[in-house]
Amino acid sequence: MLSCVAMTMMGKMDKAEKIRFLCEDETRVGLKTISGRKITAKGVKPIGQVQWKFQATYIYGVVEPKTGENFFYEFSHLNSQCFEIFLELVSQHFADSILIIQLDNGRFHKAKKLKIPNNIILMFQPPHCPESNPIEQIWQYIKRGLRWKLPASLDELRLLITARLAVMTNDIIASIVGRTHILEALSVVDI
């Protein structure tokens, strides 16, 4: 018996030639200082300036473990309306492909009124295991580059995030998210 994903894919195959596997997630990035390790002499506690501003923005993203191709977009909220818009943007960005997208079980991912584009199939990962989604390491990589930064406004933060994303080539992203077990599974099914 075919799985629901396989049956859905068969119904959509005539519209596109390429099937892609992507990983999707969202992260909040704000003006509150991201602290982290600093190099100091042995026994010397690191000191750094911090700010406690509680303004934030959300970055939605998809990455392809096989190639490192990606798409990121900023939204002011984390909700089903923004997620629906994001899916439409992803659908247009990868218009020539059927997209199987792995994502978590967030409520807004399963909203009843959510309209999913025709070339997208959502594949929900098991609950309470974010480590199974490799895009989580992309967020860590981005935030590591924002440690101890003190942007004065959200616009300044956006510039820092844009600069961080600009240096992340497809090769860098593939090296972060290209887990062996995922790549082997994709090669078995010829994706």
Regions inferred by a protein language model and the residue ranges of each:
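Acidic/histidine-rich, metal-coordinating catalytic segments
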Residues: 97-109, 133
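C-terminal anion-handling pockets and recognition modules
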Residues: 17-21, 136-191
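Short, aromatic/basic amphipathic alpha-helical patches
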Residues: 111-119
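Short beta-strand segments
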Residues: 22-24, 100-103, 123-126
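Extended, low-complexity cationic-aromatic segments
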Residues: 2-84, 88, 184, 188
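Mobile genetic element proteins and their domesticated derivatives, centered on retroelements
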Residues: 23-25, 61-62, 68, 87, ...
